[in-house]
Amino acid sequence: MENFPIINLENLCGAERDATMEMIKDACENWGFFELVNHGIPHEVMDTVEKFTKGHYKKCMEQRFKELVASKGLEAVQAEVTDLDWESTFFLRHLPVSNISEVPDLDDEYREVMRDFAKRLEKLAEELLDLLCENLGLEKGYLKKAFYGSKGPNFGTKVSNYPPCPKPDLIKGLRAHTDAGGIILLFQDDKVSGLQLLKDDQWIDVPPMRHSIVINLGDQLEVITNGKYKSVPHRVIAQTDGTRMSLASFYNPASDAVIYPAPALVERDAEENKQIYPKFVFDDYMKLYARLKFQAKEPRFEAMKAMEADVKIDPVATV
């Protein structure tokens, strides 16, 4: 079994830069996931985020989740549950307009901590997009421009806790899916595991590692790279012991961004691989995804092809 790709970003600054870029390229082409260490976000910042997130769950959300479980009779289920997930969540929006001040039940200090963390993640996401551009042979900034639309990217964090589950064989923490958006940055619990990705028809654990950031690619990067990079199905397995913390931050296109394969990549691959993905408005894709999240992505792309004739390409996103 191949080892899950773990990439030390500090190595981009020295003699190992070429080898590190090759590791990122291989991870994007063959895994759709990789794990970053020495990514520039201070450990003390991450420790503070973890402390406040776990404290907020205990104080404000744990009892609500127990009441929800009791109301649905989930502790006594005898057959597989396919229409819900064993997770307690809330969502913070950062861009284009933050909602952090409006989310109820957050301590003011937690709000400030998350604002700071989000700015650091945004910077890291944009650095990573430029590394992907370099590996793809696209001009620097191409992917950020492709996501920009009229108001800039959508960026937000799904804060999740996965409590102990009495029937993990029957209830998933989070059912298998690909992510709809662009690039996802995950700060996950380093003590309680559960995240798995599908590779070569096998479910593989994403190793919990202290102070790492797990990266995965969404459907939009698969489209823009014309399939050179793939979004990969992943899931969360519920555990009988321990509550797993997960902060998944989604750097996504603007709602009105027009997404389509990069012309330079289509031309380069023309002999063996014509343009196989549609062009569409990201918001249209998200409306479809909301209904079909836990189904295969290919029918979503096919549905977008049916709408393609009405989509105008925004010249800002061309090479």
From Swiss-Prot:
Pfam families: 2OG-FeII_Oxy, DIOX_N. Fe cation binds at H177, D179, H234. The keyword Metal-binding applies. GO terms for biological process: coumarin biosynthetic process; ethylene biosynthetic process; response to molecule of fungal origin. It catalyses: 1-aminocyclopropane-1-carboxylate + L-ascorbate + O2 = ethene + L-dehydroascorbate + hydrogen cyanide + CO2 + 2 H2O. InterPro entries: DIOX_N, IPNS-like_FE2OG_OXY, IPNS-like_sf, Oxoglu/Fe-dep_dioxygenase_dom, Plant_2OG-oxidoreductases. Pathway: Alkene biosynthesis; ethylene biosynthesis via S-adenosyl-L-methionine; ethylene from S-adenosyl-L-methionine: step 2/2. This is 1-aminocyclopropane-1-carboxylate oxidase 4. It comes from Petunia hybrida (Petunia). Residues 153-253 form the Fe2OG dioxygenase domain. Gene3D superfamilies: B-lactam Antibiotic, Isopenicillin N Synthase, Chain. Belongs to the iron/ascorbate-dependent oxidoreductase family. GO terms for molecular function: 1-aminocyclopropane-1-carboxylate oxidase activity; 2-oxoglutarate-dependent dioxygenase activity; L-ascorbic acid binding; metal ion binding. Keywords: Ethylene biosynthesis, Iron, Metal-binding, Oxidoreductase, Vitamin C. The gene is ACO4. Its EC number is 1.14.17.4. Its cofactor is Fe cation. It comes from the Eukaryota.
